[in-house]
């Protein structure tokens, strides 16, 4: 037995030794930023990765270094952290490890305050994980001496490196060898968002290659260089195009050579890659744009670089690129701005540089997703340089239905076994509905980073009113949330997102001259496609889809729900369902990976709801449909007006190409935000609807994550959605939860509408007025106690003078060069991280061009942030918890201090608990002047730490109303 155990240990060690060099190989940028289950596995449990074919190797101008470092956990204990260093340069073959060491010395200067301490780098060997695990908590840690600074960079580019603080003695305490991670808090993360990324330019920084003195690190001290000079070095050889004469009827865009000179260079617009943008605008919000046709302003955006919404055990996947087209207005604005004819920062300022890029939208509904921008670098007569950003309007180009046939369904033994999952799905569904499955709920929460604050938002201290007592995994996945409070909606929007999901595709289809959608095959993902008529109606023969006008368009949007998402589906618009068709089929996974592999949506089990809508309320009956597609282990789709799940009682055999569908004529009026169904696990929702040609669906984009109820489509020319009185029973008709609550108090008659929802508990529906009363109570409870982090910041944080915490600002130089010096948090860019000991929280805010990290202390009296049912800052250790209900803006003041403004809305009881008071408050956080050193850097990733000086809280608006439920 002992020999067998020794053999097993030897094999495991050998496999680990094989895997580490391969796992630390330089990955291409595309592989690095595409999150998948394999990429998230530690290299130690991917032993055969050495035999897998790698993607593109790093080009000669970019080298990726995987860095492991020590960080403090508590007062004495240490743990390891990881970061990626991206080294840019045109002659990296001559670069040495000392160049990177000099850059890291500047970043981690706060870790080298002790005399004779230096930053050392050595190779990370396969022994280190085990060695550090055994010695990290001891008084002495042997870290080694480090590699010589003259080591060529290419020799270590394919290896994992270990960075530590070196002392003259061969051994050191863990605390003294660890790096201070605070400078990284302002650094953007990429890919699966569990690694920080530092960008370094070898060409611009002018780093010294000389050997340092013994026991003393050489100070970096690069010569100060202007942003324009740095950009010229970075953009040398980048793609570009030229702008024609100003004032022409149509902008004359033309491709020009990178070696053009004279007047053409002054009108040149660069299209840098995401990697180039990351040097002088290091932000995860900016990404490259590839112009495909300069004549009509068509461009493509690599979605893998633009948006990722990851979570721990599995993730959304988006690859490929998406095509957009500048509108005529966008092209005119581009031409005028490039020629410097509009909005110069000051009189006499000249344009030095024009960049075409894209970024994520900020919070709100008034920016396109993605937001395409012209970035201009200006120089004033006094010699100062500043950035200016101008959004450019774009539109979806019409999809021409030129595809004649769909791809064949995959065949083969393995594909057949994988596709025939109906019996397995039923077994999994039966197990998930048993009470013993409840013990696995916490595991699912941890693996998928599920938002506990939302998941338990329907919990009530009186269990008679609670809808968050989950007796099985199935009940947890179909859980309700306090949708009326936790979702932002815009009553002006004609289309709202039907579910928490990732938008896999969104495009428009132009009909023929008769208004018919003549070809039934439409594109889906990459090279795959699906049959529109078969997808909606099954295999039966139906006439071509006829639009009301040849000038209208058919909009198609495919939305993917992951296991972490809220799994109820809400109506995206005010419309009428006239038929529902249940189409049996296969139930394999509908993940994007499978879609790209050839699985087609029209082969899947699904329920198609078909009807019509009148977006302008002028008597039209435009085609509208919402189709819910089942996923593996799902089946049994639940509709809010059906007592039993569809397909649950049907005796269906093996998964085959069914030639039969089950149609039912209905007459169901639905309102925007009204519940229409629920899934039992992850799946897909497909919206296909007819709308006027100028209908705007650009507020959300492909591969962006949307929340149920989020505005997704608007009528053109500023027209607003006509509100219907019958829809006043639902949140979608109101601007805020408070307005909805005030109306609900006066209209108990809407109970007749609300109790028709079969997803509500049966006991509530059987009691007259009960459903209305429970919706009213849940809304009051959410207004009073929702958004626990807002309550902590407003009522508990900084109430007494003392340690107010600190703030880390990422990219201060870029923010300083912004014309107004301000930035704001992007959509879904606000996250909360809690320390393991629950004594500190860190608020991470990602802006358009900079990042802010705010650290605050949590006392024992404030532990409600981590407790049931509030969970205000409970999430994955690396990914954090998404923060809702707080807006953030920040500005870099002339004295190099930061002013951070948080806007929160909280509720409280007044007058002996009879009055609900909802106040919107501004929290202004003023810091001391930030640490210096970053002013000399014009490229690369920089950050600075600022101590908080004062915290001021000022109420802006107050709304009050009488509580219906005084016992809350």
Curated annotation (Swiss-Prot):
<dbReference type="GO" id="GO:0005739">
    <property type="term" value="C:mitochondrion"/>
</dbReference>
<feature type="active site" description="Charge relay system; for autoendoproteolytic cleavage activity">
    <location>
        <position position="500"/>
    </location>
</feature>
<feature type="modified residue" description="Pyruvic acid (Ser); by autocatalysis">
    <location>
        <position position="683"/>
    </location>
</feature>
<feature type="signal peptide">
    <location>
        <begin position="1"/>
        <end position="25"/>
    </location>
</feature>
<keyword id="KW-0968">Cytoplasmic vesicle</keyword>
<dbReference type="GO" id="GO:0030133">
    <property type="term" value="C:transport vesicle"/>
</dbReference>
<keyword id="KW-0670">Pyruvate</keyword>
<keyword id="KW-0443">Lipid metabolism</keyword>
<protein>
    <recommendedName>
        <fullName>Phosphatidylserine decarboxylase 2 proenzyme</fullName>
        <ecNumber>4.1.1.65</ecNumber>
    </recommendedName>
</protein>
<comment type="function">
    <text>Catalyzes the formation of phosphatidylethanolamine (PtdEtn) from phosphatidylserine (PtdSer). Plays a central role in phospholipid metabolism and in the interorganelle trafficking of phosphatidylserine. Can act on liposomal and host cell PtdSer.</text>
</comment>
<feature type="active site" description="Schiff-base intermediate with substrate; via pyruvic acid; for decarboxylase activity">
    <location>
        <position position="683"/>
    </location>
</feature>
<dbReference type="GO" id="GO:0006646">
    <property type="term" value="P:phosphatidylethanolamine biosynthetic process"/>
</dbReference>
<keyword id="KW-1208">Phospholipid metabolism</keyword>
<dbReference type="InterPro" id="IPR033177">
    <property type="entry name" value="PSD-B"/>
</dbReference>
<dbReference type="GO" id="GO:0020003">
    <property type="term" value="C:symbiont-containing vacuole"/>
</dbReference>
<feature type="site" description="Cleavage (non-hydrolytic); by autocatalysis">
    <location>
        <begin position="682"/>
        <end position="683"/>
    </location>
</feature>
<dbReference type="GO" id="GO:0004609">
    <property type="term" value="F:phosphatidylserine decarboxylase activity"/>
</dbReference>
<keyword id="KW-0456">Lyase</keyword>
<keyword id="KW-0594">Phospholipid biosynthesis</keyword>
<comment type="similarity">
    <text>Belongs to the phosphatidylserine decarboxylase family.</text>
</comment>
<keyword id="KW-0210">Decarboxylase</keyword>
<dbReference type="InterPro" id="IPR003817">
    <property type="entry name" value="PS_Dcarbxylase"/>
</dbReference>
<comment type="pathway">
    <text>Phospholipid metabolism; phosphatidylethanolamine biosynthesis; phosphatidylethanolamine from CDP-diacylglycerol: step 2/2.</text>
</comment>
<feature type="active site" description="Charge relay system; for autoendoproteolytic cleavage activity">
    <location>
        <position position="683"/>
    </location>
</feature>
<dbReference type="Pfam" id="PF02666">
    <property type="entry name" value="PS_Dcarbxylase"/>
</dbReference>
<feature type="active site" description="Charge relay system; for autoendoproteolytic cleavage activity">
    <location>
        <position position="570"/>
    </location>
</feature>
<keyword id="KW-0865">Zymogen</keyword>
<keyword id="KW-0444">Lipid biosynthesis</keyword>
<comment type="subunit">
    <text>Heterodimer of a large membrane-associated beta subunit and a small pyruvoyl-containing alpha subunit.</text>
</comment>
<keyword id="KW-0732">Signal</keyword>
């Amino acid at each position: 037995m002992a020999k067998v155990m020794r053999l097993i240990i030897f094999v495991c060690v050998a496999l680990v030794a094989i895997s580490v060099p391969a796992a630390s190989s330089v990955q291409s940028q595309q592989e690095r930023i595409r999150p998948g289950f394999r990429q998230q596995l530690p290299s130690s449990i991917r032993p055969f990765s050495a035999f897998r074919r790698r993607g593109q190797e790093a080009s000669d101008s970019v080298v990726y270094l995987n860095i492991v470092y020590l960080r403090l956990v508590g007062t004495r204990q240490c743990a390891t952290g990881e970061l990626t260093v991206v080294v840019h340069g045109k002659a990296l073959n001559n670069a040495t490890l000392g160049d990177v060491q000099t850059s890291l010395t500047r970043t981690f200067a706060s870790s080298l305050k002790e005399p004779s301490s230096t930053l050392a780098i050595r190779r990370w060997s396969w022994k280190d994980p085990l060695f550090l695990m055994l010695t990290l908590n001891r008084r002495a840690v042997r870290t080694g001496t480090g590699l010589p600074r003259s080591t060529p960079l290419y020799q270590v580019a394919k290896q994992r490196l270990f960075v530590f603080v070196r002392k003259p003695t061969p051994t050191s305490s863990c605390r003294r060898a660890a790096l201070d991670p605070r400078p990284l808090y302002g650094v953007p993360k990429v890919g699966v968002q569990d690694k920080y990324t530092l960008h370094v330019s070898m060409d611009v920084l002018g780093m010294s290659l000389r050997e340092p003195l013994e026991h003393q690190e050489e100070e970096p001290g690069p010569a100060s260089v202007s942003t324009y000079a740095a950009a010229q070095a970075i953009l040398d050889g980048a793609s570009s195009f030229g702008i024609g004469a100003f004032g022409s009827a149509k902008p004359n865009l033309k491709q020009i050579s990178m070696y053009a000179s004279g007047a053409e260079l002054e009108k040149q617009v660069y299209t840098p890659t995401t990697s180039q943008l990351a040097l002088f605008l290091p932000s995860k919000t900016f990404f490259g744009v590839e112009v495909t046709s300069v004549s009509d302003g068509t461009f493509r955006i690599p979605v893998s670089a633009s948006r990722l919404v990851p979570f721990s055990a599995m993730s959304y996947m988006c690859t490929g690129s998406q095509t957009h087209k500048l509108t005529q207005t966008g092209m005119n604005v581009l031409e005028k701005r490039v020629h410097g004819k509009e909005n110069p920062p000051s009189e006499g300022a000249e344009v030095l540089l024009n960049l075409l890029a894209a970024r994520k939208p900020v919070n709100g509904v008034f920016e396109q997703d993605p937001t395409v921008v012209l970035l201009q670098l200006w120089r004033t007569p006094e010699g100062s340089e500043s950035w200016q950003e101008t959004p450019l309007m774009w539109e979806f180009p019409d999809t021409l239905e030129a595809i004649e046939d769909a791809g064949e369904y995959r065949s083969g033994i393995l594909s057949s076994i994988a596709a025939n999952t109906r019996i397995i799905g039923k077994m999994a569904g039966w197990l998930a509905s048993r009470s013993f499955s409840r013990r696995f709920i916490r595991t699912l929460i941890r693996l998928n980073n599920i938002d506990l604050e939302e998941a338990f938002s329907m919990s009530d201290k009186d269990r008679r009113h609670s809808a968050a007592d989950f007796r099985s995994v199935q009940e947890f996945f179909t859980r309700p949330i306090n949708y009326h409070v936790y979702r932002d909606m815009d009553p002006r929007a004609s289309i709202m997102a039907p579910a928490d999901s990732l938008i896999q595709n969104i495009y428009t289809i132009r009909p023929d001259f008769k208004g018919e959608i003549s070809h039934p095959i439409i594109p889906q993902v990459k090279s795959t496609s699906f049959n529109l008529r078969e997808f909606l109606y099954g295999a039966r023969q139906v006439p071509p889809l006829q639009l009301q006008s040849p000038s209208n368009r058919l909009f198609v949007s495919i939305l993917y729900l992951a296991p972490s998402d809220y799994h109820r589906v809400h109506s995206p618009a005010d419309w009428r369902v006239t038929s529902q068709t249940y189409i049996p089929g296969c139930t394999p996974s509908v993940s994007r990976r499978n879609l790209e592999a050839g699985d087609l949506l029209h082969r899947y089990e699904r329920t198609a709801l078909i009807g019509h809508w009148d977006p302008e309320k002028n008597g039209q009956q435009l085609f509208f449909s919402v189709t819910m597609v089942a996923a593996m282990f799902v089946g049994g789709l639940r509709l809010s007006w059906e007592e039993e799940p569809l397909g649950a009682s049907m005796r269906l055999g093996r998964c085959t190409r069914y030639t039969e569908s089950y149609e039912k004529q209905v007459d169901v009026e639905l309102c925007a935000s009204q519940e229409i169904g629920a899934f039992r696990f992850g799946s897909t929702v497909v919206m296909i609807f007819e709308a006027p040609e100028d209908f705007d669906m650009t507020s959300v984009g492909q591969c962006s994550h949307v929340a149920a109820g989020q505005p997704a489509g608007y009528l053109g020319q500023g027209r607003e959605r006509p509100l219907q009185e019958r829809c006043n029973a639902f949140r979608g008709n109101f601007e805020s939860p408070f307005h909805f609550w005030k109306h609900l108090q006066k209209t108990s008659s809407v109970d007749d509408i609300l109790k028709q929802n079969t997803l509500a508990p049966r006991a509530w529906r059987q009691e007259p007025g009960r459903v209305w009363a429970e919706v009213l109570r849940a809304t009051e409870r959410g207004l009073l106690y929702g958004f626990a982090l807002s309550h902590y910041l407003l009522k508990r944080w900084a109430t007494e003078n003392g340690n107010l915490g600190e703030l880390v600002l990422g990219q201060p130089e870029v923010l300083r060069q912004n014309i107004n010096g301000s930035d704001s948090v992007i959509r879904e860019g606000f996250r909360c991280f809690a320390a393991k000991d629950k004594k500190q929280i860190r608020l991470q805010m990602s802006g358009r061009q900079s990042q802010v990290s705010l650290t605050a202390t949590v006392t024992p009296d404030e532990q409600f942030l981590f407790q049931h049912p509030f969970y205000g800052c409970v999430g994955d250790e690396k990914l954090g918890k998404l923060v809702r209900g707080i807006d953030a803006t920040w500005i870099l003041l002339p004295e190099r201090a930061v002013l951070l403004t948080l806007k929160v809305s909280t509720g409280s009881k007044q007058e002996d608990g009879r009055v609900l008071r909802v106040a919107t408050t501004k929290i202004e956080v003023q810091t001391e002047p930030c640490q210096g050193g970053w002013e000399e850097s014009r490229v690369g990733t920089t950050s600075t730490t600022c101590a908080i000086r004062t915290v001021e809280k000022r109420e802006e608006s107050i709304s009050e109303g009488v509580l219906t439920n005084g016992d809350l």
